[in-house]
Amino acid sequence: MHRLTLIFLLYLFFLPNKGFAQFDAFFENKTLRLDYYHGGNAQNEYYAFDAWIEEPYWAGSHTSLIDTFQYGQYSFEVNDRETGKTLYSRGYTTLFSEWQTTNEAHEIDRVFSESVVMPFPKKPVIINLFSRNRSGLFEKKFSLPFDPADPYIIQQSLPYPFFDVHTPANPANALDIVLIPEGYTASEMDQFRKDCHKFAEELFAYEPYNQFRDKINIRGIEAPSAESGTDIPVKGIWKNTLLDSRMYTFGVERYLMTSNFKAVRNVAACAPYDQIYILVNTPEYGGGAIFNHYALSVNSNRSAGKIFIHEFGHSFAGLADEYYNSEVAYNEMYPLDVEPWEPNITTLVNFGKKWQDKVADSLPKPTPVENKYLNAIGVYEGGGYAAKGIYRPYIDCLMNTFRTNSFCPICKDAIRKMIEFYIH
């Protein structure tokens, strides 16, 4: 018995070292960024190469190289060109995928600038990009060879300094968040620094982030805009800002986003990061976020703290909106005959992959929204922008309304799992 225990402990001891060995064998401790264009309409999509960019920092894990979540509308893989072995993979979503569900996408084509990042390969690789089909399955859409000896790899310039907000851990063993200013002028950089510390404390006020305070790094980048604020098109307000953010994205007032993702990446490259969060210097109510893409929200609205936490739930943990009675631009974001990939909503098509095992047998399904079930994990109809056919795990949660001050147990668990993936 003692011999078996010793063998198991030795296995646990050497397992992380094996991961580090694979990283060192195949990757440099810096970032390769693939910029590309992604276009199409409601029915079709196409890709076109833009540029290879080398960035100086790699903040990601050296052991969690292969995605284990299968979240996102898209995914990509880095495969060794000689053996075909998958060396690195991640899931993600983009603004283009949301636009495809709007009315406009049935009338015209649009093209968006996108990118994916990975540790810099030491040897030639093939990078494959995948997109989910109508059934929710990944299909390969684009493939590119990469050679680290390519003389046309752009060396990313670093025009802006970064500063530490909260940095207790080695980037390789931490979740690294970079805060980027939008609509802060040079004279407002002191305010941006204060906002960075304010929102860092906001993050650590919520479970489960407060349980990982020593494993989360937060940095800010001093990147000023020429003008203060953000665009509000319907009011004729246009600001000259670094990231071209605007209210009324897809015609929805509170949806504050930017389609200039290349500019976002160029600024983010100035610091080590896993996740990008953009703070917009405006008292308006708004924000937005997309999984493994970026999050963005206002700095001084009275609800700014909860907006920040809600939006980071989208971009970091892949959480879905659980509300269904607010204005959105999307049409059938979630087909009712397909199980959504997000961990906190279900169509019951494959409920066994979600929180089914956490629902008491005695609970009715669907679970009525009644006070006696206020603290019960159940199957509550309404979520993902639909009143019927999509279900959420809790009556209320920060992914639903701001009447509550906490995430539900299912969202907490999803956030916790994602943090653990980054820090190991």
In which residue ranges do the predicted regions lie?
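Beta-strand-enriched, solvent-exposed domains that form extended recognition/catalytic surfaces
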Residues: 26-151
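Active-site-proximal segments of metallohydrolase catalytic domains
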Residues: 215-291
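Bacterial Sec-dependent N-terminal signal peptides
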Residues: 1-23
